[in-house]
Amino acid sequence: MENRLNQILVYFFLGWCIILMWSLAGMQIMLGSVIFLTLVIHLFRKEQPVKDHPFYLFAGLYILVSLSSLLRSRDIGQTLLSMLNNDWVILTIPLLASLNLSPRWRQRGLNLLILSAVLAAIYGIFQFFTGSDLIRNRALGQFGSYYRAVGAYGSFLSYAGNQLMVLACAYAAFLFPAQSRTVRISYLAAAGIIFLSIIASQSRSSWLALPVIVILGLLTVNRKQLIYISGSLVILVLAVVIFIPDLQSRFMSIFNFAQNETRLNLWRTSAAIISDHPVLGIGSGTFNDYLEIYRVPGFYDARGHAHNDYLNKAVINGLPGLITWIGMWIAWFYYMVRAYKILPQQDEDRKIILGSILAISGILVAALFQCYYTDLENNIVWWFMAAIGLQISIQKVYRPAAE
């Protein structure tokens, strides 16, 4: 019975890897199923389902500080529900990180995730040229002669953010030298297709994160190819921009303050809110209420959050909330880099660790210009990347050292 449950758990994990790129409801259902089966299996074994890791201390501190913002809320229940709308995912991480997956199944899961992202990329590129969303049966937003790709999601930002993180995994796998040339070329082709889908999304924040992923990966694995691969990326980007002038206009708008007025106004408004509420913040789900009080004069075509995850954390949870959130990710990077250095050169889990490092590095850069952590589609994939890395750290670094 227990062996059958373990097999079912693995299949649900693989299914989760596939559905992550296609459905918010699906990814939540599969995540819930993985958690439920994990608890059932450990109940059969009469074992503790969570394996210790020091990262949990940093995550727990972040949660405690975030909860402190409830002290100033006029409606504690509503604020708590709004907070848990995204941060419930973090509560599953100790269980996900403790999954006893073999390296083989972990790698298969990542391969399925990359394949799923490639299919989502092809669909997004189709949307870019046709403006058709076959899944939701709607017309897409038009920019010049082309359209914003949204994949299977409702937002181009959600689509771009998740494609960005999976691209990092495919790119890391390509950089890993201990595999055949055919396998490496397959990963490179996958990364290239996903790259085109990010371009098709017209998400400028994700565009800005791409060179960070490329350069950081090369600095980590093969500095000799830094100029060659970086130059190839520049040529590819220039080719896309030259042959599709509408994308050139979109790219140049990054540097035009007049075309970023809403974002700049939201940043200034957020700074004013933080100045008056630096310790506890304003609480989750209240940004629009305070926007009406603190808004600086000017044009706004969006609201709801600060259009910057760092500013948004400081607004919602105060400066202590921002500090503990950043500290949590610094701690995660520390444990991942430590694991990457300790694992043998030929260990395939090294490329998974590198992929998760590049993925979260990329999304943290993109988060300087947009709120991705508050988007549940992105939040789940973000924590998926973190949990996979922690899983390897627990299995191969932390617990062996403790024993």
PLM regions: where:
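Interfacial transmembrane-helix termini
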Residues: 15-34, 48-53, 64-89, 99-108, ...
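Transmembrane alpha-helices of multi-pass inner-membrane enzymes
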Residues: 10, 33-39, 172, 354-403
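Alpha-helical transmembrane segments of multi-pass inner-membrane proteins
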Residues: 12, 16-17, 107-144, 151-221, ...
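Long extracytoplasmic/lumenal interhelical loops at the membrane interface
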Residues: 257-268, 280-317, 340
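Membrane-embedded alpha-helical segments of multi-pass membrane proteins
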Residues: 25-42, 83-94, 159-167, 207-215, ...
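A membrane-periplasm/extracellular boundary helix in multi-pass inner-membrane enzymes
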Residues: 122, 128-129, 218-259, 268-276, ...
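A conserved mid-to-late transmembrane alpha helix and its immediate loop/hinge
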Residues: 195-197, 271, 277-280, 301-336, ...
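Transmembrane signal-anchor hairpin modules in multi-pass inner-membrane enzymes, especially those
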Residues: 1-81, 101-107, 111, 176-183, ...
